[in-house]
């Protein structure tokens, strides 16, 4: 059965940390493909503060061009209204039929997992893959993983990756201060930031 990773996010902007996480998940889990899913209108973020979805889609598409095993899906962008993870995974499950989905997310999401809508459907349609992030204690995360594994009769995959302390927030702030960012970004993304004059008035 084909194994497909699903990596969602606002990607505002996408940076080399995102590419590293997706690549490591692809290799470690022996996935056939990783789908990047730029968020449309995420329920947990202030929509007015997020770059236009079409531009974010363009940045992700450009960033993953060199990788044949990465692809992009515009379901959440095309979908009207709020974007919930369980709906996205249900859509992919129904679209691909005979596949095993792996939903890739960060440690912060594991900590707040009980606040997610229809969490049982997330486990029904996918394997949850959690990667560590700076500022989160590994032992506490593994304890939470065990608690959720028992509560939902599942087996969350924990990826102990290098902590790359790069964030989209940091990049936006550096652009606002007219500092160099090209070494944080995949080729071509900085050109799109310049093209649309992004992040210079936050």
From Swiss-Prot:
Pathway info: Cofactor biosynthesis; NAD(+) biosynthesis; deamido-NAD(+) from nicotinate D-ribonucleotide: step 1/1
Superkingdom of this protein's organism: Bacteria
Keywords (A to Z) from UniProt: ATP-binding, NAD, Nucleotide-binding, Nucleotidyltransferase, Pyridine nucleotide biosynthesis, Transferase
Any Pfam family hit: CTP_transf_like
Lineage of origin: Bacteria, Bacillati, Bacillota, Clostridia, Eubacteriales
Keyword Methyltransferase: no
Function: Catalyzes the reversible adenylation of nicotinate mononucleotide (NaMN) to nicotinic acid adenine dinucleotide (NaAD).
EC numbers on record: 2.7.7.18
GO molecular function: ATP binding; nicotinate-nucleotide adenylyltransferase activity
GO BP terms: NAD biosynthetic process
Entries under CDD domains matching the protein: NMNAT
InterPro entries hit by this protein: Cyt_trans-like, NadD/NMNAT, Rossmann-like_a/b/a_fold
Identification of the protein by name: Probable nicotinate-nucleotide adenylyltransferase
UniProt key word Transferase: yes
